[in-house]
């Protein structure tokens, strides 16, 4: 629908893909698609087998992992600074993760600041947001929490 809506307004390009495809029209599908990139075979397909798939260039330094940072099965974007623990998550560009933060099974979009002692699980945090120190956001029983400007939306 969106491609048809903007076809005469914007330059739209696409790739013919034979194996992996996902519609991201719902929050659950968006979450699942991002989490699929934690699988080595999906990353290999898009970034090695199809080397002409590009990301937006933003001349950022590589992610910085400070002493005590722990990252397991996660993707961390350039320009990010990690001071806490990240597990099974996708962290976009220019994200600051404060001291003693824990992020699990979540997607953190661009330009997010997570204050010290923050706990995030099963969440999607919108771009350009600040999550205050000493806060906890958890989606439970398959419910994803979308955090936008410190407002929570359960989906």
What label would you give each PLM region?
Residues 1-155:
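Left-handed beta-helix
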